[in-house]
Amino acid sequence: MQIDILSLFPEMFAGPLHESMIGNAIENDVINVDVTNFRDFTTDKHNHVDDYPYGGGAGMLLQPQPIFDALASVQEKHPAPGRVILLDPAGVQFNQHVAEDFAQEEHLTFICGHYEGYDERIRSLVTDEVSLGDYVLTGGELGAMVMIDATVRLLPGVLGNSESAPGDSFSSGLLEYPQYTRPADFRGMKVPDILLSGDHGKIDDWRLEQALKRTYERRPDMLTGLSLSGKAKQMLADIKADESEV
């Protein structure tokens, strides 16, 4: 996968793109990442990328010309079809399903904004407008890092265990079940006996029940419209009954 990032602050990506999972993905040629400073595409001697909004108002807006030209340069170097993603508070909220959708693409380009916002004509370039959440950040760089991380870890060959990504919270539609490692007894806090039993069928049932319980208690909104097996539906009904008795 080719990932391009348009940003006024390319140095912000130096650390995150060369560490841990993403660093390994680059080293193993699973992905290639290029960061382009769209200030390099300005045409005035002061390298301005922003200007005052027509009609008045607070703040400065990113001008269309530098971003149009920067994107054209990126697409000339990497003509593979793909998505152009505008980081914007008014966009669709990013979640695991969006990450899974992005992971199917050959080429992703992230446009990271700054200042008050974008000249509206910039939106004509993009295929997706995406927000990290209902809060305001100084720029789109941190949001792009999160989206890239969530997307890249889904690509084949990135995670050491091929079962890791499908078992993560949100991938199944449920929060992840509790997990334990050695020692089996730490300061009186013991690993549940079922996990030490070696009975994989019972362990799977326990994990499903715990995932349902955790989701019901912490994120009940995730259960709305979720397709559950007959066994899971009965488990959830029992969990709700137990909760109502407390």
Swiss-Prot record:
It is an enzyme of class 2 (transferase). Its main location: cytoplasm. Its EC number is 2.1.1.228. GO terms for biological process: tRNA N1-guanine methylation. GO terms for cellular component: cytosol. SUPFAM superfamilies: alpha/beta knot. One of its GO terms (molecular function) is tRNA (guanine(37)-N1)-methyltransferase activity. CDD domains: TrmD-like. Gene3D superfamilies: 3.40.1280.10, tRNA(m1g37)methyltransferase, domain 2. Keywords: Cytoplasm, Methyltransferase, S-adenosyl-L-methionine, Transferase, tRNA processing. It comes from the Bacteria. It catalyses: guanosine(37) in tRNA + S-adenosyl-L-methionine = N(1)-methylguanosine(37) in tRNA + S-adenosyl-L-homocysteine + H(+). Pfam families: tRNA_m1G_MT (PF01746). It is found in: Cytoplasm. S-adenosyl-L-methionine binds at residues 113, 132-137. Homodimer. Specifically methylates guanosine-37 in various tRNAs. Belongs to the RNA methyltransferase TrmD family. This is tRNA (guanine-N(1)-)-methyltransferase. It comes from Lactiplantibacillus plantarum (strain ATCC BAA-793 / NCIMB 8826 / WCFS1). The gene is trmD.
